[in-house]
Amino acid sequence: HSEVIFRGDSPTGKFTPWKNNPILTQRQLDAERPNPVTCAGHADLVQTREGDWWAVFLACRPINNTFENLGRETFMMPVKWSEDGFPYMTQGDDLVPVIVRREGVKRDESATFGNFEMNDGFDGQTLGMEWMTLRAPATGLYSLSQTPGYLTLKCDSVSASEKKVPAFICRRLQHHKFECSTRILFCPQSKAEQAGILLFKDEKHQYFLAVGRDDQGECISLRQIGDGESKVLASVRLDDGGVLTDLKVVSRGTHYDFYYARQEGVWYVLCRNVDAGYLSTATAGGFTGTTIGMYATLK
Protein backbone atom coordinates (compact mmCIF):
# COMPACT_ATOMS: atom_id res chain seq x y z
CA HIS A 1 0.00 0.00 0.00
CA SER A 2 1.10 3.57 -0.62
CA GLU A 3 -0.04 7.10 -1.36
CA VAL A 4 1.18 9.05 -4.38
CA ILE A 5 0.60 12.64 -5.43
CA PHE A 6 0.19 14.51 -8.70
CA ARG A 7 -0.03 18.26 -9.29
CA GLY A 8 -1.86 20.18 -11.99
CA ASP A 9 -2.88 23.70 -12.96
CA SER A 10 -6.59 22.83 -12.91
CA PRO A 11 -8.91 20.04 -11.72
CA THR A 12 -8.97 18.67 -15.26
CA GLY A 13 -5.18 18.41 -15.62
CA LYS A 14 -2.70 17.88 -16.99
CA PHE A 15 -1.15 16.35 -13.86
CA THR A 16 2.53 15.90 -13.07
CA PRO A 17 3.64 13.22 -10.58
CA TRP A 18 6.18 14.02 -7.91
CA LYS A 19 9.55 12.54 -8.79
CA ASN A 20 9.90 11.10 -5.26
CA ASN A 21 6.52 9.35 -5.05
CA PRO A 22 5.15 7.68 -2.97
CA ILE A 23 4.53 10.33 -0.30
CA LEU A 24 3.44 7.67 2.22
CA THR A 25 4.31 3.97 2.44
CA GLN A 26 5.84 1.36 4.75
CA ARG A 27 5.97 -1.54 2.30
CA GLN A 28 9.75 -1.54 1.77
CA LEU A 29 10.63 -1.66 5.48
CA ASP A 30 11.87 -4.64 7.49
CA ALA A 31 8.85 -6.76 8.47
CA GLU A 32 10.58 -7.65 11.76
CA ARG A 33 10.92 -4.06 12.96
CA PRO A 34 9.41 -3.33 16.40
CA ASN A 35 5.86 -1.94 16.60
CA PRO A 36 5.27 -2.00 12.84
CA VAL A 37 2.55 0.01 11.13
CA THR A 38 1.57 -1.51 7.78
CA CYS A 39 -0.84 -1.04 4.86
CA ALA A 40 -0.63 2.76 5.08
CA GLY A 41 -2.62 4.69 2.49
CA HIS A 42 -5.88 6.46 1.60
CA ALA A 43 -4.60 9.78 2.93
CA ASP A 44 -6.41 13.11 3.18
CA LEU A 45 -4.61 16.40 3.81
CA VAL A 46 -6.09 18.89 6.28
CA GLN A 47 -4.93 22.30 7.46
CA THR A 48 -5.26 23.48 11.06
CA ARG A 49 -6.35 26.95 12.12
CA GLU A 50 -2.70 27.68 12.84
CA GLY A 51 -1.80 26.89 9.23
CA ASP A 52 -0.12 23.54 9.88
CA TRP A 53 -0.81 20.65 7.51
CA TRP A 54 -1.63 17.13 8.72
CA ALA A 55 -2.42 13.87 6.97
CA VAL A 56 -5.24 11.56 8.04
CA PHE A 57 -4.87 8.05 6.65
CA LEU A 58 -5.55 4.35 7.17
CA ALA A 59 -3.05 1.75 8.36
CA CYS A 60 -2.79 -1.50 10.35
CA ARG A 61 -1.03 -2.59 13.55
CA PRO A 62 -0.18 -6.30 13.20
CA ILE A 63 0.50 -8.48 16.23
CA ASN A 64 3.97 -10.06 16.30
CA ASN A 65 4.44 -8.97 12.67
CA THR A 66 2.04 -11.69 11.54
CA PHE A 67 -1.65 -10.72 11.42
CA GLU A 68 -4.11 -8.17 12.76
CA ASN A 69 -7.71 -8.29 13.99
CA LEU A 70 -8.19 -4.53 14.33
CA GLY A 71 -8.84 -3.65 10.71
CA ARG A 72 -7.38 -0.53 9.14
CA GLU A 73 -7.34 2.18 11.78
CA THR A 74 -7.15 5.96 11.47
CA PHE A 75 -3.69 7.52 11.83
CA MET A 76 -2.43 11.10 11.75
CA MET A 77 0.97 12.50 10.83
CA PRO A 78 2.33 16.01 10.28
CA VAL A 79 2.93 16.88 6.63
CA LYS A 80 6.33 17.98 5.37
CA TRP A 81 6.98 19.96 2.19
CA SER A 82 9.64 19.32 -0.43
CA GLU A 83 11.77 22.07 -1.91
CA ASP A 84 9.73 21.84 -5.11
CA GLY A 85 6.42 22.27 -3.26
CA PHE A 86 5.06 18.74 -2.86
CA PRO A 87 3.60 17.47 0.45
CA TYR A 88 4.79 14.17 1.90
CA MET A 89 4.67 12.15 5.12
CA THR A 90 7.40 9.52 4.65
CA GLN A 91 10.44 9.09 2.47
CA GLY A 92 12.97 6.28 2.43
CA ASP A 93 13.03 4.46 5.76
CA ASP A 94 10.81 6.95 7.63
CA LEU A 95 8.50 5.18 10.09
CA VAL A 96 4.85 5.86 10.71
CA PRO A 97 4.79 6.34 14.50
CA VAL A 98 2.27 4.49 16.65
CA ILE A 99 1.92 7.62 18.80
CA VAL A 100 2.31 11.20 17.57
CA ARG A 101 2.70 13.89 20.19
CA ARG A 102 1.55 17.42 19.46
CA GLU A 103 2.22 20.40 21.69
CA GLY A 104 -0.89 21.50 23.56
CA VAL A 105 -2.75 18.21 23.09
CA LYS A 106 -2.98 15.79 26.01
CA ARG A 107 -4.94 12.69 26.86
CA ASP A 108 -7.96 13.10 29.13
CA GLU A 109 -10.27 10.69 30.94
CA SER A 110 -12.68 10.47 27.98
CA ALA A 111 -10.04 9.03 25.63
CA THR A 112 -11.14 5.97 23.67
CA PHE A 113 -7.69 4.99 22.43
CA GLY A 114 -4.70 3.39 24.10
CA ASN A 115 -5.38 1.46 27.31
CA PHE A 116 -8.77 2.06 28.90
CA GLU A 117 -11.59 0.28 30.72
CA MET A 118 -15.26 0.56 29.76
CA ASN A 119 -18.26 -0.76 31.71
CA ASP A 120 -21.85 -0.51 30.46
CA GLY A 121 -24.78 -1.25 32.77
CA PHE A 122 -27.27 -0.57 29.95
CA ASP A 123 -29.24 1.75 32.22
CA GLY A 124 -29.75 4.51 29.66
CA GLN A 125 -32.51 5.04 27.12
CA THR A 126 -30.22 4.54 24.12
CA LEU A 127 -27.06 2.59 23.37
CA GLY A 128 -23.75 4.42 23.48
CA MET A 129 -22.12 5.47 20.23
CA GLU A 130 -19.51 2.71 20.54
CA TRP A 131 -22.19 0.04 20.04
CA MET A 132 -23.42 -0.97 16.60
CA THR A 133 -25.49 -3.57 14.80
CA LEU A 134 -24.97 -5.31 11.48
CA ARG A 135 -26.35 -3.63 8.36
CA ALA A 136 -29.44 -2.00 9.95
CA PRO A 137 -30.59 -0.72 13.37
CA ALA A 138 -31.93 -4.17 14.49
CA THR A 139 -35.21 -2.57 15.52
CA GLY A 140 -37.32 -4.99 17.54
CA LEU A 141 -34.41 -7.32 18.25
CA TYR A 142 -33.19 -5.60 21.43
CA SER A 143 -34.56 -3.49 24.27
CA LEU A 144 -33.13 -1.32 27.04
CA SER A 145 -36.49 -0.87 28.79
CA GLN A 146 -37.96 -4.39 28.96
CA THR A 147 -35.70 -5.22 31.93
CA PRO A 148 -34.11 -2.00 33.27
CA GLY A 149 -30.38 -2.34 33.78
CA TYR A 150 -30.13 -5.11 31.19
CA LEU A 151 -29.77 -5.29 27.44
CA THR A 152 -32.55 -7.65 26.34
CA LEU A 153 -31.97 -9.55 23.10
CA LYS A 154 -34.59 -11.49 21.18
CA CYS A 155 -33.68 -15.02 20.09
CA ASP A 156 -34.51 -14.48 16.44
CA SER A 157 -34.50 -16.89 13.51
CA VAL A 158 -31.57 -15.05 11.91
CA SER A 159 -27.94 -16.03 12.45
CA ALA A 160 -24.79 -13.98 12.08
CA SER A 161 -23.79 -16.35 9.27
CA GLU A 162 -26.46 -14.80 7.06
CA LYS A 163 -26.26 -11.46 5.32
CA LYS A 164 -29.26 -10.22 7.27
CA VAL A 165 -29.78 -8.34 10.56
CA PRO A 166 -29.18 -10.60 13.59
CA ALA A 167 -29.74 -9.83 17.28
CA PHE A 168 -26.11 -8.80 17.71
CA ILE A 169 -24.99 -5.68 19.61
CA CYS A 170 -21.26 -5.26 19.13
CA ARG A 171 -18.28 -2.94 19.18
CA ARG A 172 -15.01 -2.98 17.29
CA LEU A 173 -11.88 -4.54 18.75
CA GLN A 174 -9.39 -1.77 19.53
CA HIS A 175 -6.66 -3.91 21.13
CA HIS A 176 -4.94 -7.16 20.31
CA LYS A 177 -4.76 -7.87 24.05
CA PHE A 178 -8.01 -7.33 25.92
CA GLU A 179 -10.59 -8.80 28.29
CA CYS A 180 -14.34 -8.75 27.62
CA SER A 181 -17.04 -10.15 29.91
CA THR A 182 -20.81 -10.06 30.25
CA ARG A 183 -23.44 -11.37 32.65
CA ILE A 184 -26.31 -13.19 30.99
CA LEU A 185 -29.72 -14.08 32.42
CA PHE A 186 -30.94 -16.83 30.11
CA CYS A 187 -32.77 -20.15 30.38
CA PRO A 188 -32.89 -21.75 26.92
CA GLN A 189 -36.03 -23.78 26.33
CA SER A 190 -34.91 -25.60 23.19
CA LYS A 191 -31.72 -26.67 21.43
CA ALA A 192 -32.25 -23.87 18.92
CA GLU A 193 -31.99 -21.08 21.51
CA GLN A 194 -28.48 -19.74 22.13
CA ALA A 195 -27.12 -16.52 23.61
CA GLY A 196 -23.72 -15.25 24.65
CA ILE A 197 -20.62 -13.48 23.32
CA LEU A 198 -19.84 -13.48 19.61
CA LEU A 199 -16.49 -12.63 18.03
CA PHE A 200 -17.43 -11.70 14.47
CA LYS A 201 -15.09 -11.07 11.54
CA ASP A 202 -17.58 -11.87 8.79
CA GLU A 203 -20.29 -14.42 7.95
CA LYS A 204 -17.68 -17.19 7.58
CA HIS A 205 -15.27 -16.43 10.45
CA GLN A 206 -16.67 -16.32 13.99
CA TYR A 207 -16.29 -17.66 17.54
CA PHE A 208 -19.48 -18.03 19.60
CA LEU A 209 -19.30 -18.51 23.40
CA ALA A 210 -22.89 -19.44 24.19
CA VAL A 211 -25.35 -20.67 26.77
CA GLY A 212 -27.67 -23.20 25.12
CA ARG A 213 -29.06 -26.72 25.29
CA ASP A 214 -28.12 -30.10 23.85
CA ASP A 215 -29.65 -33.58 24.18
CA GLN A 216 -28.56 -33.82 27.83
CA GLY A 217 -29.72 -30.38 28.95
CA GLU A 218 -28.36 -26.87 29.46
CA CYS A 219 -24.73 -26.28 28.56
CA ILE A 220 -22.07 -23.73 27.69
CA SER A 221 -20.23 -24.23 24.43
CA LEU A 222 -17.62 -22.59 22.25
CA ARG A 223 -18.20 -22.88 18.53
CA GLN A 224 -15.97 -22.01 15.62
CA ILE A 225 -18.26 -20.89 12.82
CA GLY A 226 -17.05 -21.23 9.25
CA ASP A 227 -18.34 -21.39 5.71
CA GLY A 228 -21.53 -23.42 6.07
CA GLU A 229 -20.27 -25.31 9.10
CA SER A 230 -20.05 -25.00 12.87
CA LYS A 231 -17.49 -26.89 14.97
CA VAL A 232 -17.78 -27.30 18.75
CA LEU A 233 -14.37 -26.60 20.28
CA ALA A 234 -15.47 -27.15 23.89
CA SER A 235 -18.63 -27.76 25.89
CA VAL A 236 -19.59 -28.19 29.55
CA ARG A 237 -22.85 -29.28 31.17
CA LEU A 238 -24.77 -26.91 33.47
CA ASP A 239 -26.74 -28.88 36.06
CA ASP A 240 -26.79 -26.50 39.03
CA GLY A 241 -30.21 -25.00 38.25
CA GLY A 242 -28.84 -21.45 38.03
CA VAL A 243 -30.09 -18.76 35.69
CA LEU A 244 -27.18 -16.28 35.80
CA THR A 245 -24.01 -16.97 33.85
CA ASP A 246 -20.91 -14.83 33.45
CA LEU A 247 -18.98 -15.25 30.20
CA LYS A 248 -15.50 -13.92 29.49
CA VAL A 249 -13.05 -13.73 26.59
CA VAL A 250 -9.38 -12.96 27.27
CA SER A 251 -7.17 -12.17 24.30
CA ARG A 252 -3.41 -12.65 24.58
CA GLY A 253 -2.89 -11.24 21.10
CA THR A 254 -2.33 -14.38 19.09
CA HIS A 255 -4.76 -16.60 21.04
CA TYR A 256 -8.06 -16.34 22.90
CA ASP A 257 -9.04 -17.94 26.21
CA PHE A 258 -12.73 -18.50 27.05
CA TYR A 259 -14.17 -18.65 30.58
CA TYR A 260 -17.51 -19.00 32.36
CA ALA A 261 -18.77 -18.53 35.92
CA ARG A 262 -22.00 -19.40 37.75
CA GLN A 263 -20.86 -17.65 40.93
CA GLU A 264 -19.47 -14.14 40.81
CA GLY A 265 -15.69 -14.19 40.51
CA VAL A 266 -15.41 -17.99 40.37
CA TRP A 267 -14.16 -18.47 36.83
CA TYR A 268 -13.68 -21.79 35.05
CA VAL A 269 -11.73 -22.32 31.85
CA LEU A 270 -13.86 -23.59 28.99
CA CYS A 271 -11.19 -23.45 26.28
CA ARG A 272 -7.70 -21.99 25.98
CA ASN A 273 -5.25 -21.18 23.19
CA VAL A 274 -7.87 -20.66 20.49
CA ASP A 275 -6.28 -19.22 17.34
CA ALA A 276 -7.01 -15.50 17.01
CA GLY A 277 -5.64 -15.59 13.48
CA TYR A 278 -8.82 -17.32 12.33
CA LEU A 279 -10.55 -13.92 12.55
CA SER A 280 -7.72 -11.97 10.95
CA THR A 281 -7.41 -10.20 7.63
CA ALA A 282 -4.68 -12.69 6.70
CA THR A 283 -7.16 -15.58 6.96
CA ALA A 284 -10.54 -14.04 6.20
CA GLY A 285 -9.53 -11.16 3.92
CA GLY A 286 -10.86 -7.63 4.07
CA PHE A 287 -9.75 -4.76 6.28
CA THR A 288 -12.83 -4.25 8.45
CA GLY A 289 -11.45 -5.83 11.62
CA THR A 290 -13.20 -7.98 14.23
CA THR A 291 -16.17 -7.02 16.37
CA ILE A 292 -17.28 -8.45 19.72
CA GLY A 293 -20.60 -8.27 21.51
CA MET A 294 -23.79 -9.84 22.80
CA TYR A 295 -25.66 -12.17 20.46
CA ALA A 296 -28.81 -14.29 20.56
CA THR A 297 -30.20 -16.61 17.91
CA LEU A 298 -32.54 -19.49 17.15
CA LYS A 299 -30.17 -20.90 14.51
Please name every model-derived segment.
Residues 1-299:
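Carbohydrate-active catalytic/glycan-binding domains of CAZyme proteins
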